[in-house]
Amino acid sequence: MNELIKAINELKKEKNAIILGHYYQKGEIQDIADYVGDSLALAQWAAKTEADIIVMCGVHFMGETAKVLCPDKKVLVSDMAAGCSLADSCPADQFAQFVKEHPGYTVISYVNTTAAVKAVTDVVVTSTNAKQIVESFPKDEKIIFGPDRNL
């Protein structure tokens, strides 16, 4: 295992890459990651990095978010089949159609959504700031909140 870790660290240096690992990853992945955190923290680290390559060890929407924030960088996702049930519960085409059918509404989406959902969103929130953001709008504001109403 030490040889593998050594090889990974050498490749990170050679390629000017960083590894971002989500809290849900196995300990072995977290051990080699340069940064470990939730989806928001990983996005923030991606946005700040000087690295040319970002290796995202998390679900696919996290890689999409990193690419949106860092369009000039190469973003690699360790497992494209790794999904998020919350993000998967909100198909972008259906969400976009729903938004289209409700003109004049402010669209707020949770950070755990795909880039395609975020593209039709006015405000992206986290679990930490969702209540504060929603309450900052006038009481009569028409709001669509996705992907679910339970947050």
Give the location of each predicted region:
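Active-site loop-to-helix "anion-binding N-cap" substructures in soluble metabolic enzymes
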Residues: 1-151
